[in-house]
Amino acid sequence: MTWILKKYFLKQYFQKRVSQGKVDIPYVEIVLTTKCTLRCESCNNLMQYFSAKNQYTCTLEGILESLNCLLENVESIQRLRIIGGEPLMFKDLPQLVHAIEKRHKIRAFDIATNGTIVPKDELLRAFKDSKRFRKVSISDYSSAPNLKIPLQQETLFKKLKEYGIDYSFLTGGIWYKVEKIYKRNRTKEGVIKNFLACQMPCVSLMSGDRGKDEARENGHIFVCPIASSLSKLKGIEEFSGDYITLEKGDLRDKILNFYAQDFFKACDYCQDYSKPRVDIPAAIQTDAVLQVEDRD
């Protein structure tokens, strides 16, 4: 009941702010990399579709440029989550944490990890010194049937306790099965229906970083991490109208229109979310890199 009331009053708060011409973002995830220590067959962020040839990893400069552009157009980001792939693989993470701490429009932030990497002391100190860093969110994959690398949960818990850093441990060990990703060719009404049935509340930001020797483009905001991953796998041109380009100028109307939108082309690539979901053990591994299929 407490969460329902909180959700209700937050909705009323954001509606009131919009009526006053204010733009507040409740929650956004920044994707640092599609590289991961695991290759989970039903990863809902589509990391199992990335190979060494098409991986995305932002630069510190690129992700901050995109984040700064967003912050120039909003009053606040209530909560920001750092994700991957596995975000602890991002070499400039301590510097990013310090940079986020200096951006006062970001009210709180945290990070999600799969528990296979123990953070270095430099990063732990950055977490500890931050006044707005809330926690490390650790997934529990101890019941996964075929992990290829060892989990570092106990060592991770010990280090976080040593530094006095809050963390949560997401126990349960059950996911739902994610079907293969491909364009279903639904009607516009069918795509909207699938979006409304899904309602994944995870707006996703990716920088415009490309290859090592290629010029950086503008970053973008997507409706979810599936959409942001698809923009890299299929090419962003495929999804025109689905995203906000983080470019110079006033983006406030575009941001408000984005949040009011109910048609996203990326939703046509997902399974039918109106049907019952099939429970499976968390983090089942696949040896093969999956492919986004082309079907008639």
Residue positions per predicted region:
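Short, surface-exposed linear patches
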Residues: 53, 64-65, 103-105, 132-135, ...
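Accessory C-terminal segments flanking Radical SAM cores
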Residues: 183-296
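Charged/polar, solvent-exposed surface patches and flexible loops
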Residues: 65, 69, 155-158, 162, ...
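A structural signal for well-ordered alpha-helical scaffolds and beta->alpha junctions
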Residues: 25, 60-63, 93, 149-153, ...
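Conserved alpha-helical substructure of the radical SAM core
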Residues: 2-113, 118-125, 129-130, 296
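Conserved AdoMet/S-adenosylmethionine-binding subsite of the radical SAM
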Residues: 90-227, 232
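Generic alpha-helical propensity signal that fires on short helical segments
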Residues: 48, 98-100, 127-129, 154, ...
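Short, charged low-complexity linear segments at domain edges
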Residues: 6-24, 169-180, 229-253
